[in-house]
Amino acid sequence: MDNLKRKHHRALVQVFFFILINYIYIDRELSLGKNLIPLLNEYAIKTISPIQGVEYFYTFITKEVFTRDFLFPSLIIMSTVCILGIFFGPVLCGWVCPLGSFQDLLSRLGQKLFKDKYDNFIKPTLDKNLRFLRMISLLIVLSALIFKITDVGKYDPAKAMYNIFVGKFETAGLIVLLITTVLSLFIRRPYCRYLCPYGALVGYSNLIRIFTIRRNPDKCSGCNKCNEACPMKLYPGKEQQTRDVQCISCLECTSEQQCPHEKALDFSVKIGKKTIKMPFSVLFAIVLCIVLGAILITSTFAYWPFLKESLY
């Protein structure tokens, strides 16, 4: 029973942020001004969108916009993304991103429709080659920003998804969103796996993250349950440690989720001979508190009028 409850932790976080982020966009676009949730605006949310997130990183690093209302929120957001990445990898992708949550929801429908055939329509060799498109996508977005092509955000499917709720439709982003929707019925997280530039950027945190997915060969029976559970179709059951840049730190493969063998696969850090495990419930609380706290603090700075003056 306890294990069943644990399986819902990530889903609860995903639903919470999906509703929260869409509310923020709706409130901004329709200017509701009702302050149902005080001190919230779109400043912090831009780092979660696939293309806008890369734009935000680029703008912060190059200081293209250097005003106080941008600087302070940016410092908080960048610190949050980096700290979470260094400790846990791209948990924003696996736990917070609304577009990722939307694809996860569609994957459940796809699994019911196609059963064992789901996510097995593409041959492994082709799947491996298609994953390079994600890096190409990142390079295209960065090139567009360098050459001052300012409308690159119109291709962002997450932005298109938010805008649907307020009756705004950008053709380019909507087309990408529709393609993602259809493909999600056949493939798990197709946009995350093959095209997301933001995922390509933050995915490199897997190479340096302190806590990582570790397999205990003595406990592992090779049942393949962990590999089947991975939404990015990685193979944690074949590795001593999972440091693939496509891992989204969802922990669906671990012994607390899908693996039937206790301590066979966990999220931990090894210090000398001692292994410190990160329980699923603790990561649940950390992600929820840190991300929500960053949004609240960021929005507080953005709401202070005197911080909107230019630094120069």
Model-flagged regions — what are they?
Residues 1-228, 232, 236-239, 245, ...:
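Non-ligating segments of multi-cofactor redox enzymes
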Residues 250-252:
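Short, solvent-exposed linear patches
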